[in-house]
């Protein structure tokens, strides 16, 4: 299950892919511009997308070697992949850990190895990736209840938020002390 999978199948994704192919072709023809067009680097981990997507499709657990930022050594374990999510140019895997008996988020750029196992699993019938992350900013989902969070910023920054919202729950509210204000319904993190 890939978050926003409907977009992957729809015209929106086809249009995006055609645009990317067109731009890629144009860039190949204009190699002299490579010092004038700058791309944001994508962290490591994209090589694990294909096996993870295959495991999601076939409902097979994966064995991965993973090293979180807080660990001095990587460890190897088996998880059941539930969904992939991209946030701020990084891919994340939400997966159920049978050993810890809970779902956890793993950053693909911290994976060292991924192997599809023969072990089958069932995705819970009530699992909905969009609902799971609905009140999260990024990939941080807390066990606490989401809260209404209000921020007040200067007009220059407000223009950015109006054109590129930080979260789907974002709403512009009444100004606070003359400054634009925005509310969000999120897990406090």
Task: Please tell me what each predicted stretch does.
Residues 87-91, 98-100, 117-121, 155-159:
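Short, charged/polar surface micro-motifs in flexible loops or helix N-caps
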Residues 131-189:
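Polybasic (Lys/Arg-rich)
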Residues 75-77, 102-106, 149, 180:
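Short beta-strand segments
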Residues 53-97:
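Loop-centered beta-sheet repeat module
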Residues 84, 114, 172-173:
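A structural signal for short hydrophobic beta-strand segments in well-ordered beta-sheet cores
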Residues 99-132:
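Flexible linker/loop signature enriched in Pro/Ser/Thr and Pro/Gly
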């Amino acid at each position: 299950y890939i978050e926003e999978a409907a977009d992957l199948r729809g015209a929106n994704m086809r249009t995006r892919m055609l645009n990317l192919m067109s731009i890629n072709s144009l860039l190949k023809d204009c190699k002299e511009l490579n010092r004038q067009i700058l791309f944001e680097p994508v962290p490591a981990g994209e090589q694990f997308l294909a096996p993870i997507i295959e495991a999601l499709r076939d409902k097979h657990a994966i064995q991965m070697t993973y090293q979180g930022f807080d660990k001095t050594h990587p460890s190897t374990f088996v998880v059941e992949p539930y969904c992939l999510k991209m946030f701020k140019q990084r891919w994340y895997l939400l997966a159920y850990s049978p050993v810890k008996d809970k779902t956890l988020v793993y950053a693909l750029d911290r994976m060292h190895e991924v192997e599809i196992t023969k072990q089958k699993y069932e995705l819970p019938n009530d699992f909905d990736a969009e609902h799971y992350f609905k009140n999260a900013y990024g990939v941080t989902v807390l066990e606490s209840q989401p809260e209404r969070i209000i921020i007040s910023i200067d007009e220059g920054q407000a223009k950015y938020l109006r054109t590129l919202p930080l979260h789907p729950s974002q709403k512009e509210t009444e100004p606070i002390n003359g400054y634009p204000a925005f509310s969000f319904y999120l897990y406090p993190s």
